């Protein structure tokens, strides 16, 4: 009986390591916190692209989240200079998720957060997949609920700011539940 228990224990310890090593994702979430402007100082939930893009190898304590111009980021960006070495906030639509990610990567962005173009979407995450071309992208690509993207952009417009300051990724398991600052319009 003891060898059987040890075998099950090894399987339980081995399986998560195998899944992580092969990149299988089941309900994978990544969190980031807006530090400024203060009226949206919340922890937001995003989902990584399913089969393209990179991963975060480092935690950015303070990095700019720059809304792309034009918002759909399907071609040349008029504010591409500000996206270099920062993270771009892009809207869904007009071209594939991979195309948007490549545009941001070509402008030197460290990652892209693509928000749904349905601003009333406060609960449905879209699975971002490759567009069947042979192209690739190396930077992380995340999907954000439309309501969250809208609220971030609206706050920046109200304050006349060109970008938000965020911390990404955030380990929410180390934050006590009562300290998690969640957007009041989003269900967790």
UniProtKB/Swiss-Prot annotation:
Residues 1-21 form the signal peptide. It comes from Homo sapiens. Glycans are attached at residue 171. Keywords: Glycoprotein, Secreted, Signal. SUPFAM superfamilies: PA domain. It holds the Pfam family PA. InterPro entries: PA_dom_sf, PA_domain, PRADC1-like_PA. Residues 83-163 form the PA domain. The record marks 121 as: Not glycosylated. One of its GO terms (cellular component) is extracellular region. Plays a role in the modulation of physical activity and adiposity. It is found in: Secreted. N-glycosylated; required for efficient secretion. Highly expressed in skeletal muscle, heart and liver. Expressed at intermediate level in kidney. This is Protease-associated domain-containing protein 1.
